Amino acid sequence: MIYLVEDDTNIRELVTYTLNHSGLDATGFERPSQFWKAMEQKLPDLVLLDIMLPEEDGLSILRRLRAAPATASIPILLVSAKNSEYDKVMGLDNGADDYLAKPYDLE
């Protein structure tokens, strides 16, 4: 199960569609509150996480996931339009497993 937290509807729908049609099980969330509700029901195998989100930024979500024993080891890939070296270092220093700058190729 892959969870994608992305507020851009076009990106969220394209990525979840592509992952699902590649044989993976992906669910997209527009808002962090939707993501947290789903996390109470089922933990994913991977989280794709935008940084700039409504309600709560991606780095805050990342820190919360890493601080909780039940979610600390879930792989997290930050996906963001913020692509400076500083942004990438901040993401990795806060516990992301990798950082992918938008726009990106789904292949």
Question: Which ranges hold each PLM region?
Answer:
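His-Asp phosphorelay/catalytic-motif detector in bacterial-type signaling
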Residues: 43-45, 70-75
